[in-house]
A protein has these predicted regions:
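C-terminal partner/receptor-binding element of secreted or periplasmic proteins
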Residues: 118-144
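N-terminal signal peptide c-region/cleavage motif recognized by signal peptidases
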Residues: 14-18
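N-terminal secretory signal peptides
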Residues: 20-64, 68-72
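Structured segments of extracytoplasmic/periplasmic soluble domains
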Residues: 48-56, 91-95, 105-109, 123, ...
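Mid-chain, structured segments of secreted extracytoplasmic proteins
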Residues: 62-111
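Active-site-proximal beta-strand/loop segments in catalytic clefts of secreted hydrolases
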Residues: 35-38, 64-68, 103-105, 125, ...
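Sec-dependent N-terminal signal peptides
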Residues: 4-13
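Stable alpha-helical elements in mature extracytoplasmic
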Residues: 41-48, 81, 85-88, 98, ...
Length: 144
């Protein structure tokens, strides 16, 4: 009788003991989006970021901009369709996306921080930041 009770107990307990390593199939991705080719690339890149967050709202996303890639982060910047980038950037920031701007680009292009949208982060080198995020922090690399 004791064996039957033990067997039933183990049978009932078995489903609870099954441990799935992926209890959340959509975990927090860590992704760096690399933008360096102007407004067209930026428009596509922001759309990709929106899609990424729709698929995985927990994603940790950093957008690193340098060279012509900083242009969309300037005050008054608009896409080829005439849409202001400022609102899209602000919406993504509210979802936790971080935007980092290359200070070398600013220096070489004679640009000032005052010309850019608020709440941006500035890094010494955009390229070095992309490498650092990949190598040291385990971010996946995406370039639209």
């Amino acid at each position: 009788m004791a064996r039957i009770i033990l067997s039933l107990f183990l049978l009932l307990l078995a489903p609870l003991c099954h441990a799935d390593a992926r209890t959340d199939p959509v975990g927090p991705d860590k992704v760096v989006y690399h933008l360096n080719a102007g407004l067209e690339q930026a428009a596509a890149g922001l759309e990709y970021v929106r899609n990424h967050l729709e698929a995985n709202p927990k994603a940790q996303i950093v957008v690193v901009a340098h060279a012509l890639g900083v242009d969309f982060l300037m005050k008054g910047a608009k896409s080829a369709r005439g849409n202001a980038f400022a609102q899209a950037v602000e919406d993504l920031q509210l979802q936790g996306v971080r935007f980092r701007v290359c200070e070398i680009t600013l220096r070489e292009r004679n640009l000032r921080r005052e010309q850019f949208l608020p709440e941006l982060e500035y890094v010494r080198s955009g390229v070095a930041e992309v490498g650092r995020l990949q190598q040291r922090e385990g971010f996946a690399y995406l370039r639209p």
